[in-house]
A protein has these predicted regions:
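Short intrinsically disordered, low-complexity coil segments enriched in acidic
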Residues: 1-7, 53-56, 211
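Hydrophobic/aromatic-rich core segments of domains that either
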Residues: 147-211
Length: 211
């Protein structure tokens, strides 16, 4: 089972109801980041119902026209030199923050290879520290999974002045590991999606004006 201090949420929550009142006493929600923390740690048997709204996803054109928001973030430490060098080469000439973010994502998607490094996979080390990110961006082959690519892109975005963070969550996948809605069921106006541990993944979130 999932054991973590962060409670899985979807969209902007308007209410969260726990099956037992004692669980509700250990719950905190940040409306700005739309994230929830559960200091008692999640464990088997924990049950809760979230009611909320999924924000509208902006179109590619809307993203491209958006400027980067002005948000104060802690300075990233021990960042490999290749991060700023590659980010500048890819998107340093973009006038809009949204365009720069898209350029980074497109380049990593086009140039990189995906591998978890499991048995039968192409060799790929776990982790997202200084050495691993340098290996990903400046090594002989760009190979990694969502952990490495999300960390690398977040650092590259920061180097260009784009406020960014790495989010950990769930994306429903089919048996081939591709994003799919095969486990999504509609019941009238409600939609239910079942997730498993294999659906855990990481992605980058960049704050743009208006989104």
């Amino acid at each position: 089972g999932l054991s973590d201090y962060w409670l899985p949420m979807a969209g902007a929550a308007s209410s969260v109801k726990f099956a037992t009142s004692s669980d509700a006493d250990s719950f905190y929600y940040n409306t700005d980041t739309m994230s929830a923390i559960y200091p008692s740690r999640t464990s088997p048997g924990l049950s809760y119902t979230e009611t909320g709204v999924i924000p509208r996803t902006p179109t590619d054109k809307e993203i491209a026209k958006a400027n980067a928001s002005s948000i104060s973030q802690p300075k990233a430490e021990d960042v490999p030199d290749c991060v700023d060098k590659l980010a500048t080469a890819i998107a340093g000439g973009q006038s809009k923050g949204g365009e720069a973010a898209q350029a980074l994502a497109d380049k990593l998607r086009e140039s990189g290879w995906f591998s978890h490094g499991l048995n039968g996979d192409y060799p790929s080390r776990a982790g997202h520290g200084n050495y691993r990110i340098d290996q990903l961006l400046a090594g002989s082959a760009m190979v990694g999974d969502s952990e490495q690519y999300a960390s690398a892109m977040a650092l590259m975005a920061r180097s260009l002045g784009l406020p960014s963070r790495v989010a950990l969550g769930f994306l429903p996948k089919n048996d081939e590991g591709e994003i799919s809605d095969s486990r999504t069921e509609k019941h009238g106006k409600t939609t239910t999606t079942k997730f498993t541990g294999n659906d855990v993944t990481a992605w980058v979130e960049i704050k743009l004006d208006g989104y």
